[in-house]
UniProtKB/Swiss-Prot annotation:
InterPro entries: QueC (IPR018317), Rossmann-like_a/b/a_fold (IPR014729). It comes from Campylobacter jejuni subsp. jejuni serotype O:6 (strain 81116 / NCTC 11828). Belongs to the QueC family. One of its GO terms (biological process) is queuosine biosynthetic process. It catalyses: 7-carboxy-7-deazaguanine + NH4(+) + ATP = 7-cyano-7-deazaguanine + ADP + phosphate + H2O + H(+). One of its GO terms (molecular function) is zinc ion binding. ATP binds at residues 9-19. This is 7-cyano-7-deazaguanine synthase. Its cofactor is Zn(2+). Zn(2+) binds at residues 190, 198, 201, 204. Keywords: ATP-binding, Ligase, Metal-binding, Nucleotide-binding, Queuosine biosynthesis, Zinc. The keyword Magnesium does not apply. Its EC number is 6.3.4.20. Gene3D superfamilies: HUPs.
Protein backbone atom coordinates (compact mmCIF):
# COMPACT_ATOMS: atom_id res chain seq x y z
CA UNK A 1 0.00 0.00 0.00
CA UNK A 2 1.42 3.39 -0.98
CA UNK A 3 1.78 6.13 1.60
CA UNK A 4 -0.76 8.92 1.27
CA UNK A 5 -0.54 12.66 1.89
CA UNK A 6 -3.40 15.10 2.14
CA UNK A 7 -2.25 18.28 0.40
CA UNK A 8 -4.13 21.49 1.14
CA UNK A 9 -3.94 23.38 -2.16
CA UNK A 10 -5.30 26.91 -2.38
CA UNK A 11 -4.27 27.37 -5.99
CA UNK A 12 -1.37 29.55 -4.91
CA UNK A 13 2.34 29.16 -5.46
CA UNK A 14 3.31 27.93 -1.99
CA UNK A 15 0.71 25.19 -1.58
CA UNK A 16 1.28 24.00 -5.14
CA UNK A 17 5.01 23.64 -4.56
CA UNK A 18 4.26 21.70 -1.37
CA UNK A 19 2.13 19.25 -3.34
CA UNK A 20 4.93 18.75 -5.86
CA UNK A 21 7.39 18.13 -3.03
CA UNK A 22 4.99 15.58 -1.54
CA UNK A 23 4.82 13.79 -4.87
CA UNK A 24 8.61 13.83 -5.09
CA UNK A 25 8.73 12.13 -1.69
CA UNK A 26 6.66 9.30 -3.12
CA UNK A 27 3.28 10.12 -1.64
CA UNK A 28 -0.01 9.36 -3.29
CA UNK A 29 -1.63 12.78 -3.19
CA UNK A 30 -5.15 13.48 -2.04
CA UNK A 31 -5.85 17.13 -2.80
CA UNK A 32 -8.00 19.39 -0.64
CA UNK A 33 -9.31 22.85 -1.50
CA UNK A 34 -11.51 25.19 0.52
CA UNK A 35 -14.09 27.63 -0.79
CA UNK A 36 -14.71 30.29 1.85
CA UNK A 37 -16.27 33.04 -0.28
CA UNK A 38 -12.95 34.79 -0.71
CA UNK A 39 -12.74 37.47 -3.42
CA UNK A 40 -10.84 35.26 -5.85
CA UNK A 41 -12.73 32.04 -5.10
CA UNK A 42 -13.58 31.17 -8.71
CA UNK A 43 -10.03 31.73 -9.95
CA UNK A 44 -8.50 29.78 -7.08
CA UNK A 45 -10.85 26.85 -7.68
CA UNK A 46 -9.98 26.87 -11.38
CA UNK A 47 -6.26 26.86 -10.55
CA UNK A 48 -6.76 24.02 -8.07
CA UNK A 49 -8.38 21.87 -10.75
CA UNK A 50 -5.59 22.61 -13.25
CA UNK A 51 -2.92 21.84 -10.67
CA UNK A 52 -4.60 18.54 -9.79
CA UNK A 53 -4.61 17.65 -13.47
CA UNK A 54 -0.92 18.55 -13.82
CA UNK A 55 -0.10 16.41 -10.77
CA UNK A 56 -2.32 13.58 -12.03
CA UNK A 57 -4.20 13.57 -8.74
CA UNK A 58 -6.80 10.80 -8.70
CA UNK A 59 -8.77 11.95 -5.65
CA UNK A 60 -9.60 15.50 -4.66
CA UNK A 61 -12.01 17.38 -2.45
CA UNK A 62 -13.44 20.89 -2.73
CA UNK A 63 -15.15 21.74 0.55
CA UNK A 64 -17.53 24.61 1.23
CA UNK A 65 -16.51 26.53 4.36
CA UNK A 66 -18.40 29.69 3.46
CA UNK A 67 -19.29 30.21 7.11
CA UNK A 68 -15.87 31.89 7.30
CA UNK A 69 -17.34 34.81 5.38
CA UNK A 70 -20.14 35.03 7.94
CA UNK A 71 -17.52 35.45 10.66
CA UNK A 72 -15.97 38.28 8.63
CA UNK A 73 -13.46 40.76 10.00
CA UNK A 74 -11.07 40.63 7.06
CA UNK A 75 -10.59 42.12 3.60
CA UNK A 76 -10.48 38.79 1.77
CA UNK A 77 -14.13 37.96 2.42
CA UNK A 78 -15.58 41.42 3.13
CA UNK A 79 -15.57 43.63 0.04
CA UNK A 80 -16.45 46.68 2.11
CA UNK A 81 -12.92 46.53 3.55
CA UNK A 82 -10.22 47.81 1.20
CA UNK A 83 -7.24 45.61 0.46
CA UNK A 84 -4.01 47.57 1.16
CA UNK A 85 -2.08 48.44 -1.98
CA UNK A 86 1.59 49.02 -2.75
CA UNK A 87 2.83 48.33 0.74
CA UNK A 88 4.25 45.14 2.19
CA UNK A 89 2.84 44.65 5.65
CA UNK A 90 5.68 43.82 8.06
CA UNK A 91 4.30 43.89 11.57
CA UNK A 92 3.66 41.88 14.69
CA UNK A 93 -0.01 42.79 14.30
CA UNK A 94 -2.11 40.74 11.86
CA UNK A 95 -2.94 42.73 8.69
CA UNK A 96 -6.51 43.31 7.55
CA UNK A 97 -6.06 40.46 5.03
CA UNK A 98 -5.67 38.00 7.91
CA UNK A 99 -8.67 35.66 8.05
CA UNK A 100 -9.11 34.83 11.76
CA UNK A 101 -7.85 31.33 12.55
CA UNK A 102 -8.25 30.23 8.93
CA UNK A 103 -5.43 27.70 9.02
CA UNK A 104 -6.74 26.38 12.32
CA UNK A 105 -10.12 25.75 10.69
CA UNK A 106 -8.50 24.25 7.60
CA UNK A 107 -6.26 21.92 9.59
CA UNK A 108 -9.09 20.75 11.84
CA UNK A 109 -11.06 19.69 8.77
CA UNK A 110 -7.92 18.27 7.14
CA UNK A 111 -7.27 16.19 10.24
CA UNK A 112 -10.71 14.63 9.97
CA UNK A 113 -10.29 13.91 6.27
CA UNK A 114 -6.75 12.59 6.74
CA UNK A 115 -8.03 10.09 9.29
CA UNK A 116 -10.84 8.98 6.98
CA UNK A 117 -8.39 8.57 4.06
CA UNK A 118 -5.67 7.04 6.27
CA UNK A 119 -3.09 9.67 5.29
CA UNK A 120 0.17 9.68 7.18
CA UNK A 121 0.96 13.32 6.36
CA UNK A 122 -0.77 16.64 5.76
CA UNK A 123 1.11 19.16 3.62
CA UNK A 124 0.33 22.86 4.02
CA UNK A 125 2.18 25.77 2.43
CA UNK A 126 2.51 28.12 5.38
CA UNK A 127 5.35 30.65 5.21
CA UNK A 128 6.59 32.87 8.01
CA UNK A 129 8.30 35.29 5.62
CA UNK A 130 8.82 38.92 6.61
CA UNK A 131 7.01 38.63 9.94
CA UNK A 132 3.72 39.26 8.19
CA UNK A 133 1.76 38.95 11.41
CA UNK A 134 -0.24 35.83 10.51
CA UNK A 135 -0.31 33.92 13.83
CA UNK A 136 -1.53 30.69 12.20
CA UNK A 137 1.44 30.50 9.81
CA UNK A 138 4.15 29.87 12.39
CA UNK A 139 6.02 26.64 12.98
CA UNK A 140 4.96 26.76 16.62
CA UNK A 141 1.28 26.92 15.67
CA UNK A 142 1.64 24.01 13.24
CA UNK A 143 3.29 21.83 15.88
CA UNK A 144 0.46 22.51 18.30
CA UNK A 145 -2.11 21.81 15.58
CA UNK A 146 -0.45 18.45 14.94
CA UNK A 147 -0.64 17.61 18.65
CA UNK A 148 -4.29 18.67 18.75
CA UNK A 149 -5.25 16.53 15.75
CA UNK A 150 -3.42 13.46 17.03
CA UNK A 151 -4.95 13.88 20.48
CA UNK A 152 -8.46 14.07 19.06
CA UNK A 153 -8.33 11.22 16.55
CA UNK A 154 -8.24 7.43 16.85
CA UNK A 155 -5.42 5.83 18.83
CA UNK A 156 -4.37 3.79 15.79
CA UNK A 157 -4.06 6.93 13.65
CA UNK A 158 -1.16 9.37 13.65
CA UNK A 159 -0.54 12.17 11.20
CA UNK A 160 2.37 14.53 10.63
CA UNK A 161 1.82 18.08 9.39
CA UNK A 162 4.59 18.93 6.95
CA UNK A 163 5.53 22.54 6.18
CA UNK A 164 8.57 22.40 3.90
CA UNK A 165 8.42 26.12 3.08
CA UNK A 166 7.81 27.61 6.51
CA UNK A 167 11.33 29.11 6.83
CA UNK A 168 11.80 30.13 3.19
CA UNK A 169 11.34 33.56 1.61
CA UNK A 170 9.55 34.07 -1.69
CA UNK A 171 12.77 34.15 -3.72
CA UNK A 172 13.79 30.75 -2.34
CA UNK A 173 10.28 29.44 -2.99
CA UNK A 174 10.34 30.60 -6.62
CA UNK A 175 13.84 29.17 -7.05
CA UNK A 176 12.81 25.79 -5.63
CA UNK A 177 9.60 25.73 -7.67
CA UNK A 178 11.52 26.34 -10.88
CA UNK A 179 14.01 23.62 -9.94
CA UNK A 180 11.15 21.16 -9.38
CA UNK A 181 9.44 22.15 -12.66
CA UNK A 182 6.31 23.40 -10.90
CA UNK A 183 3.96 25.07 -13.43
CA UNK A 184 3.80 28.43 -11.65
CA UNK A 185 1.76 29.86 -14.52
CA UNK A 186 -1.13 27.73 -13.23
CA UNK A 187 -1.00 29.33 -9.78
CA UNK A 188 -2.70 32.47 -8.47
CA UNK A 189 -1.64 34.78 -5.65
CA UNK A 190 -3.66 37.98 -6.09
CA UNK A 191 -6.03 38.85 -3.24
CA UNK A 192 -8.32 41.03 -5.33
CA UNK A 193 -8.60 40.20 -9.04
CA UNK A 194 -9.51 37.06 -10.96
CA UNK A 195 -8.84 38.03 -14.58
CA UNK A 196 -5.47 39.77 -14.30
CA UNK A 197 -3.47 40.01 -11.07
CA UNK A 198 -3.56 43.51 -9.58
CA UNK A 199 0.20 43.64 -8.98
CA UNK A 200 -0.37 45.90 -5.98
CA UNK A 201 -1.71 43.83 -3.08
CA UNK A 202 0.59 42.34 -0.46
CA UNK A 203 0.43 38.88 -2.02
CA UNK A 204 1.19 40.13 -5.54
CA UNK A 205 4.09 42.24 -4.28
CA UNK A 206 5.66 39.30 -2.46
CA UNK A 207 5.26 37.10 -5.53
CA UNK A 208 6.73 39.71 -7.89
CA UNK A 209 9.63 40.36 -5.53
CA UNK A 210 10.39 36.64 -5.44
CA UNK A 211 10.50 36.38 -9.22
CA UNK A 212 12.57 39.55 -9.51
CA UNK A 213 15.19 38.31 -7.07
CA UNK A 214 15.75 35.10 -9.04
CA UNK A 215 15.75 36.94 -12.36
CA UNK A 216 12.80 35.05 -13.83
CA UNK A 217 9.69 36.58 -15.40
CA UNK A 218 6.34 35.60 -13.92
CA UNK A 219 4.14 34.17 -16.67
CA UNK A 220 0.76 35.17 -15.25
CA UNK A 221 -0.92 38.38 -16.44
CA UNK A 222 -0.80 41.57 -14.40
CA UNK A 223 -2.87 44.71 -14.83
CA UNK A 224 0.17 46.96 -14.77
Amino acid sequence: MSKKALCIISGGMDSTLCAYLAKKEGYEIIALHFDYEQRTQEKERECFKQICKALKVEKSYILDVSFIKDIGGNALTDKSIDIPKNELCISDTPPITYVPFRNGIFLSIAGSLAEKENCESIFIGVVEEDGSGYPDCTDEFIQKAQEFINEGTSKNFKVYIKTPLVRLNKAKIVELALKENVPLELTWSCYESEDEACGECDSCLLRLRGFEKVGFKDKIKYKS
